[in-house]
């Protein structure tokens, strides 16, 4: 079937592939912890008692430990809030309901593997290295199980195939999650965190790599923590901010109402996407960004 014909199929009888959300589905809900489970206070209390040094590699620098503790303090405060989501529930309208942790407490690592700069480094997502993550994931699966058992979902024939209704204890559910979970749902972040050096940061507030002159990092790796949602819009915002600030260095900072960047002092043809730059005169001294 030609791609352009797909919308017409939906017009005829309200069915067809265009009526089914694609690639992972649409979000059903972004749930705060207290909407996931009534045991949220016990989960938070248990998490606050865990020694962070036991969760990191034995050779982790003290700055990494300090940064991790600072992040856990922030995250556990958010776990208490009725307005901060910790789980995303997505449904493709077909045969799969996905549950994603959007404020995980676990932390991974990235290490040099060899002296060959071409070889890839060693990544370890550290999935479920913080035991609270598994507690939250278990509670979230049980919440989704209750939802799929509701009358409206049963009316459309919802049934559970994995892990299966026979898997009922928290211990068994947690085991099934460990076996079936993936470490990242196409949203890896935070390998070059924008933090102070005292907290284990890699780049500063201008995204300059500490200790390396002339090198910046501009992507999702600079997020100190995973954003509580999808990453694309935040990546766009970071790139837009950096591109604008970099343009100021060379005097290219004119900004027109039609949302096109133009070199300062240039003439802009409103009827075209082309810029006429015969009179390129920077209106300020190049900065130090």
Question: How should these model regions be labeled?
Answer:
Residues 163, 170-171, 233:
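Alpha-helix boundary/capping detector
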Residues 1, 96-152, 178-289:
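C-terminal structured subdomain/cap of oxidoreductase catalytic cores
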Residues 130, 167-175:
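Intrinsic-disorder/low-complexity, polar/charged segments
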Residues 8, 116-122, 155-158, 170-173, ...:
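Surface-exposed beta-strand-to-loop junctions
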Residues 7-32, 97-99, 106, 111-117, ...:
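Contiguous hydrophobic segments
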Residues 1-92, 165, 169, 179-180, ...:
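Mid-to-C-terminal "cap/lid" subdomains and adjacent gly/pro-rich loops that border
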């Amino acid at each position: 079937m030609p791609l352009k014909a797909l919308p017409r199929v939906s017009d005829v009888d309200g069915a067809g592939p265009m009526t089914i959300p694609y690639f992972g589905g649409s979000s059903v809900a972004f749930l705060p912890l207290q909407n996931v489970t009534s045991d949220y206070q016990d989960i938070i209390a248990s998490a606050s008692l865990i020694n962070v040094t036991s969760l990191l590699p034995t050779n982790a620098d003290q700055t990494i430990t300090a940064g991790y503790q600072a992040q856990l303090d922030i995250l556990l405060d958010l776990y208490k809030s009725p307005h901060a989501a910790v789980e995303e529930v997505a449904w493709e309208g077909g045969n799969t309901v996905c549950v994603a942790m959007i404020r995980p407490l676990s932390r991974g690592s990235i290490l040099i593997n060899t002296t060959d700069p071409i070889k890839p480094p060693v990544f370890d997502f550290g999935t479920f290295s913080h035991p609270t993550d598994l507690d939250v994931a278990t509670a979230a699966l049980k919440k989704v199980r209750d939802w799929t058992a509701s009358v409206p979902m049963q009316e459309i024939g919802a049934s559970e195939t994995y892990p299966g209704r026979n898997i009922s204890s928290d211990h068994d559910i947690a085991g099934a999650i460990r076996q079936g979970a993936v470490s990242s749902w196409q949203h890896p972040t935070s390998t070059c965190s924008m933090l102070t050096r005292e907290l284990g940061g890699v780049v500063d507030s201008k995204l300059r790599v500490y200790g390396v002159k002339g090198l910046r990092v501009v992507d999702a790796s600079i997020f100190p923590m995973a954003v509580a949602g999808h990453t694309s819009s935040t990546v766009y915002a970071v790139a837009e901010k950096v591109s604008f600030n970099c343009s100021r260095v060379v005097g290219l900072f004119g900004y027109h109402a039609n949302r096109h960047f133009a070199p300062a002092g240039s003439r802009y043809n409103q009827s075209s996407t082309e810029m006429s730059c015969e009179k390129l005169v920077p209106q300020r001294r190049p900065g130090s960004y």
